Amino acid sequence: TSPLRNYKDIDNAFEAMFDADATAVISTCEFDNKILKTFIKKSNGFLRGISNDKYPFMRRQDLPSTFMPNGAIYIINHKSFREENSLMTSKTLSYVMPKDRSVDIDCNNDLAKAELMFNAK
């Protein structure tokens, strides 16, 4: 549930999809790129970088920007969905939204945060 998304976000996401000749759009917000510095512990106990083995040792300023789905918008061409059986296609576009409209309500704390942000407008 994304109550702070508005109709302009949806319209703009469709427009971006058509302009880019994309097959899908997922709304996102920028996310702290330090996630790229994390490791996964394999079943044998050895570590590997979550994305690759270079990022954990790079300066954060040199890491690529990262984006987290915010749950507000998922648009996909029905033919692509049937062919790939996934919301993610090879031509999925990110529709970046500001953090103040990227509250996804999954629990009571999220609801309280959304209410505060809504009332602040």
Model-derived regions: residue spans:
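Conserved core of the sugar-phosphate nucleotidyltransferase
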Residues: 3-91
